[in-house]
């Protein structure tokens, strides 16, 4: 197995603002995190609000200490009006080519040296630029929890979206927009991982979120088993003949 390892942002520090009392320890933490990811292996880190908690210069110093690409498609240098980081990275793994784009909606535009472009416009520009160049497009988005429900409409041509910026976590049983893009959230500070296994059965076909359907089947199976435990030898339609609500639930399962 040779997985693609990505971070959607808010990795380096534990807060969006550093002060004298925590600056040294937080910068040490950020450097230690990068050293750890260097050993583990990481294919891209999206620049989120926490990455800029110490300012741009400390972030650039940390980024210079690693070969891991920091990406951002909507953070510009205020002096040159050019992107500070590469907007995306291309990854070829297992015969599948991925285009991974970094975006943020949480970084304050009051930070010196920084211009924050509209992440929705920047994201769609680079998604369009990748058409025909990659098999799958992946967005790493650092944004508020309130935006997650709209991301599939904002970026309809994306395949997978991984978010940071809140403690919200997706579960396999959570329903996703049919045909994608599928949105995944892993909480905060790298405490949890979202593992997505991808199999391409039909090039150009629709994307199916298999984990949701499997979780749903397992849930209904357990529910029917609980109903059957009451008297395993009696058919369910006889066992609950006088309980139409349960029969309806069994039928739905």
Give the residues covered by each predicted segment:
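Acidic, metal/ion-coordinating pockets
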Residues: 1-253
């Amino acid at each position: 197995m040779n997985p693609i390892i990505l971070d959607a942002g808010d990795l380096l520090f534990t807060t969006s603002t550093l002060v004298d009392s925590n600056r040294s320890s937080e910068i040490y933490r950020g450097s230690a995190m990068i050293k750890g990811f260097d050993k583990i292996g990481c294919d891209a880190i999206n620049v989120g609000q926490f990455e800029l908690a110490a300012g741009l210069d400390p972030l650039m110093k940390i980024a210079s200490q690693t070969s891991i690409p920091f990406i951002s498609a909507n953070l510009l240098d205020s002096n040159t009006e050019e992107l500070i980081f590469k907007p995306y990275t291309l990854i070829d793994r297992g015969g599948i080519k991925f285009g991974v784009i970094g975006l943020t909606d949480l970084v304050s535009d009051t930070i010196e040296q920084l211009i924050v472009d509209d992440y929705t416009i920047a994201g769609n520009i680079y998604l369009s630029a990748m058409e025909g160049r990659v098999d799958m497009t992946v967005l790493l988005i650092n944004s508020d929890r309130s935006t997650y429900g709209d991301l599939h409409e904002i970026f309809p041509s994306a395949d997978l979206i991984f978010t940071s910026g809140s403690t919200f976590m997706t579960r396999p049983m959570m329903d996703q927009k049919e045909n994608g893009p599928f949105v995944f959230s892993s909480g905060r500070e790298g405490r949890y991982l979202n593992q997505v296994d991808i199999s391409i059965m039909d090039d150009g076909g629709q994307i199916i979120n298999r984990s949701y359907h499997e979780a749903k089947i397992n849930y209904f199976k357990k529910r029917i088993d609980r109903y059957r435990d009451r008297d395993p030898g009696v058919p369910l339609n006889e066992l609950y003949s006088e309980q139409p609500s349960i029969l309806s639930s069994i039928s739905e399962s």
